Curated annotation (Swiss-Prot):
InterPro entries: Ribosomal_uL18_bac-type (IPR004389), Ribosomal_uL18_bac/euk (IPR005484). The keyword rRNA-binding applies. The gene is rplR. Keywords: Ribonucleoprotein, Ribosomal protein, RNA-binding, rRNA-binding. Pfam families: Ribosomal_L18p (PF00861). This is Large ribosomal subunit protein uL18. It comes from Tropheryma whipplei (strain Twist).
């Protein structure tokens, strides 16, 4: 499969997914964006259009860890869950961003669940 068709397939999956889910203030959307090197996670309230908390592998605490990409994604999931719990969010809707639920995307969800966030 060529790179352009893979990217367009991911975009189609994401559009299809976003039709079905949206976040609220009580239960925000946990949006995962993945690049070749980094993972970015945001807890988004779609009603007001605001990001409540965010975390990524580009933060100093996570960058300092001598881990692989999947283990760092797990740490990002734990970090975003801790920050969400600190602002009073107990559960979230998981938005995989059109990516398949495996590897780093699944690790973010597992990390968030381990830290106490219900997804």
């Amino acid at each position: 499969m060529s790179l352009t068709s893979r990217a367009s397939a991911r975009k189609r999956r994401h559009v299809r997914l976003r039709k079905k889910i949206s976040g609220t203030c009580d239960r925000p959307r946990l949006s995962v964006t993945r690049s070749n090197r980094h993972v970015f996670v945001q807890a988004v309230d779609d009603i007001s259009g605001k990001t409540l908390v965010s975390a990524s592998t580009m933060e100093k605490d996570i960058r300092a860890l001598e881990l692989g990409k999947t283990e760092r994604a797990l740490a990002v999931g734990k970090l975003v869950a801790q920050r969400a719990l600190a602002v009073g969010v107990k559960s979230a809707v998981f938005d995989r961003g059109g990516c398949k639920y495996t590897g780093r995307v699944a690790a973010v969800a597992e990390g968030a669940r381990e830290a106490g966030l219900q997804t």
